[in-house]
A protein has these predicted regions:
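Bacterial N-terminal signal peptides that target proteins for export
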Residues: 1-8
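Bacterial N-terminal signal peptides
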Residues: 8-17
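Boundary at the C-terminal end of the N-terminal hydrophobic targeting segment
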Residues: 18-24
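Beta-strand-centric surfaces of beta-sandwich/beta-rich domains
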Residues: 24-266, 271-368
Length: 368
């Protein structure tokens, strides 16, 4: 779990597993807000592609400053909704969002919400939540929540993977969001924010596998045709964010990015997001030093279970610390997985489509 969504991103899930979190929610005076897409959307992929990314402006009609305790994306078409991301619309972007969704039918948004410029999601992180297979209600841990101001709105980005439609039948979708919140006034709940940690993806065709799209340049041209030009530039943008040379990419089955923090915060939970070639992910604080701590370790990544993991003990991070995200992949899965095996071999980069890849670590934290 839109920046770029999306990446796909995925996204942040704070799916509660502890009974004390559930009990705490029951004791709170919660107000429920439910909102669905203004109009039903019939997914379609551009230029003979297989993926449709669509953003919708939604107004939950929140009447007071609040703190979100739980939020749930409820897909109407579970078979081909690949993932969804819920963004907060910032004051700076509300006019643009209203203009883009005048008809209530949303707008194409490969790579984030499309608001605020390229890679804005990775820079400003206006995420609230995300959904992917295996996730249910996104419930913050006991004592924590996400601030949401009176009158604020969501942008809901939905990724439709049309390859997954049952029998190839595509129907209209009108998914919805259900949110539970407490008033900010008088609340003792600590406020969470989201930090995103992307890494470049550069996967060459496996040994012995050939085809026109095994050439990186041709693969990026194809990516632009299936999505848009901005999406094809994301690989270079993310490499630059990670301090790597975007003009000299190095193919590898391991993706890594180090990010130096410029503020203090405390990590409460972490979640992984990759696509179908992903094998493992780690998020490491201060790697290679005596202060090294493992924030997230997913040794056997499962696309159908991208739930966030609440840390046993919150971990403080200070300005100047380094956080590394590291992902590993198996490109041979393109020839083995039913959903990918019929597609042409290709050099795989960061991209929004189900047949592209991502390496995205997501952290939920409180500001110090």
């Amino acid at each position: 779990m839109k920046t770029r969504a999306l990446i796909t991103l995925i996204l942040l899930s704070l799916l509660a597993t502890a009974t004390n979190a559930i009990a705490a929610e029951k004791r709170e005076v919660l107000k429920t807000y439910s909102v669905k897409m203004v109009k039903a959307h019939l997914p379609s992929a551009p230029n003979n592609g297989t993926d449709d990314y669509r953003c919708f402006l939604l107004d939950p009609k929140v009447t007071e400053d609040s703190i979100i305790r739980s939020i749930q994306f409820i897909p109407q078409r579970k078979d081909y909704v690949h993932h969804a991301i819920i963004f907060r619309v910032t004051d700076a972007n509300i006019s643009e969002a209203i203009s883009r969704d005048k008809s209530g039918t949303g707008w194409p948004c490969f790579g984030g919400s499309g608001l605020g410029g390229m890679l804005s999601s990775f820079v400003t992180s206006p995420w609230i939540s995300s959904w992917a297979p295996g996730r249910g209600i996104d419930l913050s841990p006991a004592g924590y929540g996400i601030p949401f101001k009176k009158g604020e709105r969501f942008v809901l980005q939905v990724h439709y993977n049309l390859l997954a439609a049952n029998g190839g039948k595509i129907e209209t979708d009108q998914s919805r969001i259900v949110m539970k919140a407490v008033p900010s006034k008088g609340a003792t709940v600590k406020q969470l924010h989201v930090e995103l940690f992307p890494a470049p993806v550069e996967l060459a065709c496996p040994s012995g596998v050939t085809g026109p799209l095994c050439d990186r340049k041709q693969a990026l041209i194809d990516l632009a045709g299936r999505t848009n030009n901005a999406s094809a530039l994301e690989a270079a943008g993310i490499a630059a964010l990670c301090g790597q040379n975007p003009f000299k990419p190095i193919a590898s089955t391991t993706s890594t990015c180090d990010k130096v923090m410029n503020s203090n915060f405390t990590v409460i939970a972490a979640a992984p997001h990759m696509h179908l070639l992903g094998r493992s992910m780690k998020i490491i604080l201060n790697p290679g030093t005596s202060a090294e701590k493992l924030l997230l370790n997913v040794p056997n990544y499962n696309f159908d279970d991208q739930s966030a993991i609440v840390l046993k003990k919150p971990v403080p991070v200070t300005a100047g610390d380094t956080i590394r995200v590291q992902c590993t992949y198996d490109p041979t899965l393109r020839q083995k997985l039913p959903s990918l095996s019929k597609l042409a071999p290709r050099y795989v980069t960061w991209g929004e489509g189900s047949s592209d890849e991502m390496c995205l670590g997501v952290i939920a934290a409180t500001k110090s």
